[in-house]
Structure formats: structure tokens, C-alpha cells
Amino acid sequence: MAVVKLSPWANYSSSKSEIKSSSSSSSSKSSLSAYVINVSSSPRLSFYNPYPRRLHHQRLSSPASIRCSVTSSDQIQAPLPAKQKPECFGVFCLTYDLKAEEETKSWKKIINVAVSGAAGMISNHLLFKLASGEVFGPDQPISLKLLGSERSFAALEGVAMELEDSLYPLLRQVSIGIDPYEIFQDAEWALLIGAKPRGPGMERADLLDINGQIFAEQGKALNAVASPNVKVMVVGNPCNTNALICLKNAPNIPPKNFHALTRLDENRAKCQLALKAGVFYDKVSNVTIWGNHSTTQVPDFLNAKIHGIPVTEVIRDRKWLEDEFTNMVQTRGGVLIKKWGRSSAASTAVSIVDAIRSLVTPTPEGDWFSTGVYTNGNPYGIAEDIVFSMPCRSKGDGDYEFVKDVIFDDYLSKKIKKSEDELLAEKKCVAHLTGEGIAVCDLPEDTMLPGEM
């Protein structure tokens, strides 16, 4: 993994005539040439010495660094060439004439975003949204730290090449690797997408254990090297219990910072309500997904609104709401697979963007959003010490608070209890991964979503 760090306000201009190589013509091809760079202002540029691609999971000591020092107001002199060939790509490896401009001077400090499963289909849609500024804003430069596996490493290189070819001004740094202790270093956001799919004949308990081990290790890595206030979004399924495992293995990170993605379910519920009412999607608000990201999830129509009016007053067919609507949301992924031949990737990426933006932008007055969060301190009577999807609001600072003004009826309470019981059973299944003793697996039924197959 190799990295070139650029000042967050610096801008590229490839005036190669101003770049003079200070390395001799006999320098090894495996060396990183040193350059003298003439600049019109005095930005700072620092290189980190690359090291070979990792082919096993083992934490390395910090790489040696190469730093440029300003010798005059118009010249930066790089030191001797590095000894190893960098594992980096295009503009993330080369040195350019850097000029400060008014636009980039106003940019925020660079943000470190780690993504696991970075060579997968969901990431293939998500990474370009992150790099474009769609997620964190047009003045937020970003460093992407991409985690893959030995098997996917060549594909991960291809992803990095595509990011290079896309010329995103806000994308200031890309690093790739297979060791979470490297990739999660100083991460301020961790989007944990990678997980093992369910194979033929695999019991749900087996998948909970296999993926649980992945998220236990990633939790330990985040605990050791990530920013102390890192925000963690768990996408890999079963995401609620994976998020619980991850947070239990990261005691230095506030449990409140962990989320399980249920935003795609919320988006699907909004879509079906809008179609039934004959309105556009943006007229639907206050939709909650309660519980587990499984077929026990509860799309809440009781508290939802259309044009600010309770859904039950707009759509007066209660039977449709309880039966057809609920079933459509719960099984939408399976229907999509039958039509498309693969699980949802693009819409999942969109929902990740929505979920992050709900945390980094203030929630509109009177509205809320769904996210799977740690239940301790919740006002709904949900059992504590699990990760459960509930309605939340945010002030736009990355934090959230529970919504208090929600109503329940017998139907909604009964459905929520079923999902709660399922998550409590899953928790017992992974007790060996959360530090709570011996695992006892007695899952009530197989409610795994089709996309987990």
C-alpha cells in the first residue's frame, strides 16, 4: 500500500516542464524518483514510503516516511529515492505543480473513509459517490482507504484505477490493502460492506458465526487504530448482529457510533406508500423500519405521513397496509433477485449515501429516519444490549437522538416483539464473539433475507 498525501487546498496542474528529476538515469525501475518541483506558492507535500503488497493478515510496523522540506519560497526539494516500487495509481503516485486557488483554500480538512468489501458490487457504485462529493459535500476532500482480500486484490487494483481515471478533484488519497489494522488507521468513517454470502446448505447459525468472526476482527482493528470517534456503518449481513459483534470488540469507541443499515428497507417502504397514494416519494415522511434487517422487520405505517397527514387517513385500506404493504417491503429483495438475477447493489449504495447524509445534515423539522443502533437508553421498551432499527433524528454532527413522539398499537407492538425476540436469539448465537460466554443457538425460524443467500 502506498500513499501520496496532498494538502487539502492544493490543486493539480500537470505542468510537467516544471518537474525536474533529481534521480540519475541509472536509477532502478523499482525506485520512486525524487523531484525538484517549482511552485508559484508554498504548499506542503509529503510522501510516505510504500511497502510491498500484503499477502497475509499481520500488522506491520509504521512505514518509514519521506518528507519534503521547503528550501525557499518557490522550491520544494524531495530527498533520495525510495527503495521499493509503490503500490499506487496515477495521480496518487505522481508529483505535480501544485497551486493554491481560492476554491480549494475554502475546503474542509481531509476526511478518512474506510470501506471494506471495496472490490464488490455495492462498493463499485458507492465509491464514486463518495469521491464525487455527493455524500460529504462539495467542499470536503476525501481519503479513501479500501479493504479487500487476497482473492479480490487484483479487482481492488482495478477499482483504484477507475477512481484514478475519474479525475475527482475532491479525491486526494487512495490506499488499498487486505489488513484492517492498516486500512482502518485514523478512519473517521468505516463502511463495513464485505461479508461472506450464504452458501448452499449453510444454516443461518453458521453464517452468523462465520461473518461474526470477520466483524469481531474488524471491531478490534477499529478499536486499535481508527479515530476514537469513528462512525461505523455495518452493511454486511446479518447486519444487526454483525454491528453488535463489532461494537462489543471495540470498547474504546462509543457504542452509539455503530449503525446497521436499514435505510434501503425504509426507502422501499416509502416507495410503496407513494405508489399506493399516487404521490411522489418526497411527499412521504416519518417512515420507520423497526427491528432486524430480516423478514421480521416492521415497516411502520402507523406513524408515517403523506403530505403531513397520517398514512392511515390517506390510505384507508388497513388490510392492505398490514398484509400486502408489509409483505412487499419484507420480500422486495427476493423479488428483485428473481427479476435481475442478482441482489440489489446500486440501490444499497444509494441507501448508504442516504444513511450517512441523514447523520451529517440536520433532520428536517418534524421528520426522522431509520437506522439500526444500540438499544441502551431507548424510550420504546426495546430490550437493551442489541442493535435494533428505530426512528432517529440528527443535528447534522454525525450524532443522533431517539424520536420520542411515536405511537404504538397492538399490531405494531406485536410485530416489533417478534423482531426483538429474533435479535435476542441471534445474540445468544454469537455469545462467544461478544465476550459473553458459550454460544447457544436456538433461532426461532429462518428469516434471512434473500440477498444474504
From Swiss-Prot:
Reaction equations catalysed: (S)-malate + NADP(+) = oxaloacetate + NADPH + H(+)
GO cellular component terms, A-Z: chloroplast
Origin species: Flaveria bidentis
A molecular function (GO) term: L-malate dehydrogenase (NADP+) activity
Listed InterPro entries: Lactate/malate_DH_C, Lactate/malate_DH_N, Lactate_DH/Glyco_Ohase_4_C, Malate_DH_AS, Malate_DH_NADP-dep_pln, Malate_DH_type2, NAD(P)-bd_dom_sf
Entry similarity comment: Belongs to the LDH/MDH superfamily. MDH type 2 family.
Assembly and binders: Homodimer.
Description of how activity is regulated: Chloroplast NADP-MDH is activated upon illumination. In order to be enzymatically active, disulfide bridges on the protein must be reduced by thioredoxin which receives electrons from ferredoxin and the electron transport system of photosynthesis.
Protein name: Malate dehydrogenase [NADP], chloroplastic
Role, per record: The chloroplastic, NADP-dependent form is essential for the photosynthesis C4 cycle, which allows plants to circumvent the problem of photorespiration. In C4 plants, NADP-MDH activity acts to convert oxaloacetate to malate in chloroplasts of mesophyll cells for transport to the bundle sheath cells.
NCBIfam families: Malate-DH_plant, MalateDH-SF1, PRK05442.1
Subcellular location: Plastid, Chloroplast
Annotated binding of NADP(+), by residue: 117-123, 211, 218, 235-237
